[in-house]
């Protein structure tokens, strides 16, 4: 099948690799190179780099909402468009430009976690099951019909990186299965109940509320690493917790109290045992290294 691919980050790479192997990728659309590092050198997106290595034509428009881009897409000899974490809204004229429309990999059990941050919200909400869906896109926000779906259980303390990689690889495999059977698949309309929205994360959301349960705080730590990071303030400095574990233990302490010299913190229910931290503008340290340089005394009440 002849394919136009639209995507940008590492999450989209496994799918493009599969498409290059099994189909004919006619063109790739991705975000423009961005300045990175201290030298602010322009860096291609992971998708741009992969397409470049395979000598696939790459386009980096600043928007899809203009006639020039729509005409360009219409001229590309393709049967279908695949869109994965591209970063731009796809207008109706492009959604309907090819025979089989536009397909999208969405890493959640739709209609749960529609929106920009389904992986993060899955972990933050403490979900124990999830899915990867192949969806035919329409003009709504992740409201299109489901062509194929695979459910799976989540490990209790899965990290964002682990979930990201699992869904990216599973989605790539599911996409190839979908394309192989696309003429025989009966699309399934998403149910109207159970709709939730995985809104984009904000830095403010990362602030830890010690009145929440240790389990919920641990979910936030895993779901917000690396960005924005779950953090607390100490001596007017922001400190991110990169890794921790929760203990289902009863206690009589005020929420936020440091109850040991190993940085175990009393929460609304349970205790959070911190394992890895990062003070702003400093490198990440395990708890032993951190406490050698920053002494957070027992009985301190964190805010």
UniProtKB/Swiss-Prot annotation:
Domain of life: Bacteria
InterPro entries: Fmt, Formyl_trans_C, Formyl_transf_N, Formyl_transf_N_sf, Formyl_transferase-like_C_sf, Met-tRNA-FMT_C, Met-tRNA-FMT_N
Keyword Amino-acid biosynthesis: no
Binding site for (6S)-5,6,7,8-tetrahydrofolate: 108-111
Gene Ontology cellular component terms for the protein in this record: cytosol
Leading EC class: transferase
Record-stated family: Belongs to the Fmt family.
Protein name: Methionyl-tRNA formyltransferase
């Amino acid at each position: 099948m002849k394919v136009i691919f639209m995507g940008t980050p590492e999450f989209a790479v496994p799918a493009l690799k599969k498409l290059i192997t099994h189909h004919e990728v006619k063109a790739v659309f991705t975000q423009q190179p961005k300045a990175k590092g201290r030298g602010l050198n322009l860096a291609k997106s992971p998708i741009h780099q992969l397409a470049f290595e395979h000598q696939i034509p790459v386009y980096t428009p600043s928007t899809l909402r203009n006639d020039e881009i729509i005409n360009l897409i219409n001229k590309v000899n393709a049967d279908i468009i695949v869109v994965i974490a591209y970063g731009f809204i796809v207008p109706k004229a492009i959604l309907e430009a090819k025979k089989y429309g536009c397909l999208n990999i969405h890493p959640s059990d739709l209609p749960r976690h529609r929106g920009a941050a389904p992986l993060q919200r899955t972990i933050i909400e403490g979900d124990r099951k999830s899915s990867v869906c192949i969806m035919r896109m329409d003009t709504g926000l992740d409201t299109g019909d489901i062509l194929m779906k695979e459910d799976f259980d989540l490990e209790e303390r899965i990290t964002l990186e682990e979930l990201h990689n699992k869904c990216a690889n599973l989605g790539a495999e599911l996409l190839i299965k979908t394309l192989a059977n696309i003429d025989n698949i009966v699309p399934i309309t998403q149910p109207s109940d159970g709709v939730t929205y995985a809104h984009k994360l904000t830095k403010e959301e990362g602030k830890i509320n010690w009145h929440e349960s240790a389990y919920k705080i641990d979910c936030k730590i895993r779901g917000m690493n690396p960005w924005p990071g779950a953090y607390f303030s100490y001596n007017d400095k922001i400190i991110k917790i990169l890794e921790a574990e929760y203990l289902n233990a009863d206690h009589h302490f005020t929420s936020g109290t440091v109850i040991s010299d190993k940085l175990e913190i009393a929460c609304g229910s349970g205790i959070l045992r911190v394992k890895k931290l990062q003070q702003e503008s400093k490198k990440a340290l395990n708890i032993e290294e951190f406490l050698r340089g920053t002494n957070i005394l027992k009985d301190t009440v964190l805010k």
